[in-house]
Amino acid sequence: FVNGTHIHFLSRTPSPKIIADAFATVKPDLIITVPLVIEKIIKKKVFPTIEKPHMKLLMNIPIINDKIRESIRQKVIDAFGGKFKELIIGGAALNKEVEIFLRSIRFPYTVGYGMTECGPLLTYDNWKTFRQSSCGKAVPRVELRIDSGDPQHIVGEILAKGICVMTGYYKNPEATAEVIDANGFLHSGDLGVKDENGNYRITGRIKDMIIRGGENIYPREIEEFLYKMPGIKDVQVAGVPSKKYGE
């Protein structure tokens, strides 16, 4: 994947200014980050500009629209140092509105999925072939399964097996037995589906899933919808007890 790399560590709490200065100085070739970093740049620096009436009008003209998007793409790339070949996002779900915009300007990003117990990467795909809303395909030497009768259409827990998967928690056989089954598969606790091309999409966490009268409700999908509404800074969906529906 990479070799002969130089890793730069920030010596202070990574405020937006400190991060921006570091990118400008280091000019990284590869960036691995959480969604919050790219979302802040797009939402605070880009969206306010392109949502102005005159910009919306200009972006309805094909030739001008292409030039505007290319200009925005370059400015966002420059904000990350200007040299990187790919920006890999992980650790949480990428905001759908931001992702759609990144795709529209052909920004070189991709989304990966993993966990500490797995070394940590389980899925990844090059940004040029990455499928929107997914988190890529299983990486080499890793076997992934969706614990579902129909992995393409019915959500199930993501199970992982491979040389990068831990053998167990240190001196804690009870905790190990709870997550690694008899076949050697690690139960991630994450829910997802897999399309016909092997791309995985995370839908939520088992512990977060709300069961209402037998119906499975995934908070993340509702949160994504509410998050786009004006005036909402943050949102969290939680189930409440119900005698009629159970939760």
Predicted regions and their residues:
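Conserved ATP/PPi-binding loop(s) of AMP-dependent carboxylate-activating enzymes
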Residues: F107, K137-P140, D150-V179, E215-I217
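AMP-binding/adenylate-forming catalytic core of the ANL superfamily
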Residues: G162, T167-G168, L191-E247
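Gly/Ser/Thr-rich phosphate-binding loop
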Residues: D29-I32, I42-R131, E143
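Short secondary-structure boundary segments
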Residues: R12, P35, Y113
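Conserved ANL (AMP-binding/adenylate-forming) active-site segment centered on the GW(Y/F)…HTG consensus within
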Residues: K67-R69, R73, V165-G189, I206-K207, ...
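Thr-Gly-centered strand-to-loop micro-motif
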Residues: L10, I89-G90, I146-S148, V155, ...
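Active-site glycine-centered loops adjacent to acidic/histidine catalytic or metal-binding residues
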Residues: G91, G114, G136, D190, ...
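ATP-dependent adenylate-forming carboxylate-activation enzymes
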Residues: T5-V26, I217-I222
